[in-house]
Amino acid sequence: MNLPSRFLSLRATAVALAVAAASLSASPAMAQTKTLYIGMNGGTMEKTYTGHVFGAFEKANNIKVVVVPGTSSDILAKAQANKDNPQMHVMFLDDGIMYRAIGMGLCEKMQPSQALNDLFPTARFKGDMAAGVNVGMTGLAYNKKMFAEKGWAAPTSWMDLADPKFKGKVVFQSLASSTFGLHGFLLFNRIQGGTEKNVEPGFKAWPTTIGPNVLEYIPSSAKVAEMVQTGEAAMFPLTPTAVGVLKDKGLPVEYVQPKEGSAVLTVGECVIAKNSEPALAHKLAQYLLSPEAQAAALEHGDQIPSNPKTKATGAAAALVKQMNEYMKTATTVDWDVINENRPAWNARWNKTVER
């Protein structure tokens, strides 16, 4: 009678040990499956990175990368609101807003890496507190279909926005909420004899030049596609990358590098200070600067690489070559002066331009 009870006891022990072993072998994997949250623009950028860039990093590190979508201003506000207990680990911001984030103490210094060393000099932020993940410039875009129907020549200058024949056909992003709008205004201001330290010429000339032609001031560029489709928009500030996205959707738009030049626009990344996973966050940030990550972003989302070692072929290589040509007449703006004066400019813009 002892044998069956011993047998049952041994069997029960074996089962218990097997269950324990299974749980032990599973627990490290479960513990390692962490989630990193990254703030960035929604739409094309989010789809590109989620669908084609993050996967290799997620697989190699057994983690999940989740996008918190929003404009640069939205992402900055979220980071600032949770400064002492960050909900995000990394964030992408337009360069001007990134300088504000750095000034607010929201970013950790980038850790040294080969990818960081390889970047274009213009893609490295002061003190390496952030780094550019892609580069571009704000110039002019136009509705090719409308121009063809009207027999208009393609625009060549920022001052074409003031041509009376475009009355009610110009769409302009708000200076107060859009880097494209800010760039467009500042380059117009320079043509009028101003500088970032003196925007009086631009504000003074606007109501009698570009102002009368503007159909609508839009908070972001999201509405541009719709206004091109409906035949409302003839011309607007935009980047070659954004134009490429619209063309991929079948919209009749083209980019023009104005003869006065364009404004350099870099999308930067920074690791958020005091985040819950600093080591993984820095590892992700370094990966996103690598030629491999940037090649995927270029191929699938026309994101122009900040790392010149990124390999490109076919149409992507042609795009990079064209962008390098545009960069020859692209100009940088003074973000320190801009950020110091932006609140006053925004208030004046809202009161005198968008009233």
At which residue positions do the language-model features occur?
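Extracellular/periplasmic bilobal clamshell ligand-binding domains
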Residues: 315-355
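Periplasmic-binding protein-like
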Residues: 136, 204-210, 217-218, 249-273, ...
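Early extracytoplasmic/lumenal segment of secretory-pathway proteins
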Residues: 32-100
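Short beta-strand->loop
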Residues: 108-117, 129-131, 159, 235, ...
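Mature extracytoplasmic/periplasmic domains
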Residues: 272-330
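A bilobed periplasmic-binding-protein/Venus flytrap-type ligand-binding module shared by bacterial periplasmic
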Residues: 141-146, 186-191, 265-278, 296-299
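Extracytoplasmic ligand-binding site segments that recognize negatively charged/polar headgroups
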Residues: 43-50, 87-88, 92-226
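A ligand-binding cleft/hinge motif common to bilobed small-molecule-binding domains
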Residues: 96-100, 229, 235-252
